[in-house]
Amino acid sequence: MGHGRRISESIKKQLPVTGPEAPTVKNLMDWYLNNTNTHGCRRIAVSRGYLRRWIWICFTVSSVGMIFWQWTLLLMSYYTVSVSVTVQFQTLPFPAVTICNINPYRKNATSALLEELDKQTKLILKELYTSCTGCSNRKLRSVLLNEAPEEDSGVAKLLQDMPLMKFEVIKEDHVIVSELSSNRQYRINNTFITRMYNNMDLATVGEQVGFKICDANKSNCIIYTFNSGVTAILEWYRLNYLNIMAQIPNEKKLEMGYSADDLIVTCMYDGQSCDSRNFTLFQHPLHGNCYTFNSGDDGNILQTLTGGSEYGLKLTLYLENDDYNPYLFTSMGAKIIVHDQTEYPLVDDVGLEIQTATETLIGLQVTTSAKLSKPYSDCTMDGSDVLEQNLYNTSYSLQICLHSCFQTEMISNCGCAYYEQPLPSGAEYCYYEKYPGWIYCYYQLQDKFVNERLACQDICKETCNSKDWDLTKSLARWPSVASKDWVLNLLNWERGLNNTLNKNDLASIAIFYQDLNLRSLSESPANSIATLLSNMGGQLGLWMSCSIVCFLEMWEVFLVDILTIIARYWLHRGRQWWRKRKERQMQQPSPPDHDTGHHNPVCIDDEDPPTFHTAMQLPCVQTGPVPSTPPPQYNALRIQSVFDEQVSDTEVN
């Protein structure tokens, strides 16, 4: 007890509560502010001037407020142990579904246009049947020629200039080729082989089938050979077909194609009936009249409330097997593409083929992707920063950009547009009568495009935001053996076909959401600005006990104070220079006035020797400094000495 009393008395003695030596709150705050390690509080005490002091007070109070706010959030998050579960039933927009018949036009509508082409194709096939049975696999090649044989004038010009050929005799230094339509033969010398498009060794050339194409001047020609006669004929027929269709106006092609009522037999959506009025026409260059369900052109997009095969879109298509062109496509059925309402249906790129006599179930799962743009990736948000015109007038995509770029290069290099892609304003599609070298130019450009020697792959970018549908396809025979008779009889009666309908003319399709889960893939930066500042602040606090207030102190000292000192120094130097300049101007004498001559009657400078005239003039006033007169030296008069001497003389006398 005595020891505690002694400590209490010592404290009262050293820290009196009353009296003149008792500390006040102001003294305590001054001591704290001058000795604390809290940077902002110390700056309040040592700052000079009320403005700086109030600025530091505001910074410090704001920092304290941020600390308490963050602490409150952290404590609330730490002590919150409740769990909430939210269940929502959402609807998903049903995608647009575009349906095309693989066969683009009715056979009776194109028979007159394709008569000569079909005739030549049959003759070529007959020749191949008798001479090319059992052909082995071959590689894709092309051979450069510089001369062509004489052509018959009884066939179309393109069929003359682009004949199908077969390699006959192979020697060490040349190859003999024959035209399948005319049986004419000519040889390709080894000198021409060295200039070929993709060089090939003559020793490896077997019996090949290909066709010849030339430029507009026929100075350079190429024979393309294929690994199969079927592939060669399909490609040769397709080029001739495109050449013919490029000259047909869209109005006539619309009449030649299938109508929505011809193509669509039955339609159901979410258990409700639909018909051709719910479809929008879409003209495709290769597949003719296509039709889009839920296109959104009227401003309404259908929503799906329930997933499963019992819902969604169900269709029965009539594809008319006997109406197919046997040389244009070797497959039969329909092409379907699922896409967003703002996207262009690229049928040939991502279209799904549906076969006849089959029920096809297509389950959908939608996934949205969001990628980070620069500097994390070189993607584009909407294509506005891509230096390529969108010829499809739809939302941007990488494929749309590549096709548009190729069409632009085609017009720039070949002078005309490729038929399978949109036609830009002011251009026209290529056809042989007006552009005889377009096929040669197209293959040259296609080779550059495939080998990425065009600028398209550098110009076009991927999209940052995209929506993709994952398709799950399942097949079943349709109609079944048990239901075949009544289904076909009923459809024959509805369409008035007099029992000519068979199951190979029909295809059943069901497109539905497997579930209504929307999958989202998004990118986030691994190191954000907040993470960077947090890590840097942690290192500064760990090793230097520094915070953002330290940077404010540095900003005040090294920026504000140093700039103030520098400005004050140069201002002082400027004032000194100006003061010295004024002093030099005040000390500098004024220049003398030297007005002389006969016109000056007042004064004239001295002449040597003087004349009478100058002697009568006044001398010029001296403008220089007047010499000072020294004070008289009175002792030089020696008056007293003179008087003394006189007195002395008198006295002597």
Swiss-Prot record:
InterPro entries membership: ENaC (IPR001873), ENaC_chordates (IPR004724), ENaC_CS (IPR020903)
Regulation of protein activity: Originally identified and characterized by its inhibition by the diuretic drug amiloride.
Any Pfam family hit: ASC
Membrane topology: Multi-pass membrane protein
Entry's localization field: Apical cell membrane
Principal localisation: membrane
PROSITE patterns the record matches: ASC
Regions of this protein lying in the Extracellular compartment: 76-546
Alphabetical UniProt keywords: Cell membrane, Disulfide bond, Ion channel, Ion transport, Membrane, Sodium, Sodium channel, Sodium transport, Transmembrane, Transmembrane helix, Transport
Region of interest: Disordered: 582-608
Disulfide-linked positions: C100-C290, C214-C221, C267-C274, C379-C464, C401-C460, C405-C456, C414-C441, C416-C430
Segments on the Cytoplasmic face: 1-54, 568-653
Expression sites (tissue/organ): Strongly expressed in gill, liver, kidney and rectum and more weakly in heart, muscle and intestine.
Regions crossing the membrane: 55-75, 547-567
Gene3D superfamilies attached to this UniProt entry: Acid-sensing ion channels like domains, YojJ-like
GO biological process: sodium ion transmembrane transport
One GO location term (cellular component): sodium channel complex
Keyword field contains Disulfide bond: yes
Superkingdom to which the source organism belongs: Eukaryota
GO molecular function, one term: ligand-gated sodium channel activity
Function field: This is one of the three pore-forming subunits of the heterotrimeric epithelial sodium channel (ENaC), a critical regulator of sodium balance and fluid homeostasis. ENaC operates in epithelial tissues, where it mediates the electrodiffusion of sodium ions from extracellular fluid through the apical membrane of cells, with water following osmotically.
Family the UniProt entry places it in: Belongs to the amiloride-sensitive sodium channel (TC 1.A.6) family. SCNN1G subfamily.
Assembly and interaction partners: Component of the heterotrimeric epithelial sodium channel (ENaC) composed of an alpha/SCNN1A, a beta/SCNN1B and a gamma/SCNN1G subunit.
Protein name, UniProt field: Epithelial sodium channel subunit gamma
Taxonomy of the source species: Eukaryota, Metazoa, Chordata, Craniata, Vertebrata
